[in-house]
Amino acid sequence: MAVEKFETALKKLEEVVKKLEGGELSLEDSLKAFEEGIKQAAFCSKKLNEAEKRVEVLLKQKDGRFITEQFQPEDE
């Protein structure tokens, strides 16, 4: 199975939302679309969590040098 990219999964999720909001799907098709949407949302959430762990903030020191620190969200 090919590795899916975040952007691809997000686009699929947006398409599912559009279909569901359209109100044209049968109950069965709505459930299938909802299930696919949950799958794509979970994938996107996982990828965002992985990215957050990798983000580094570049800080400029008074002497002009730059250092890196691990990203710390404000709520931590």
UniProtKB/Swiss-Prot annotation:
Pfam families: Exonuc_VII_S (PF02609). Its main location: cytoplasm. NCBIfam families: PRK00977.1-4, PRK14066.1, xseB. This is Exodeoxyribonuclease 7 small subunit. GO terms for cellular component: cytosol; exodeoxyribonuclease VII complex. Bidirectionally degrades single-stranded DNA into large acid-insoluble oligonucleotides, which are then degraded further into small acid-soluble oligonucleotides. It comes from Geotalea daltonii (strain DSM 22248 / JCM 15807 / FRC-32). It is found in: Cytoplasm. Keywords: Cytoplasm, Exonuclease, Hydrolase, Nuclease.
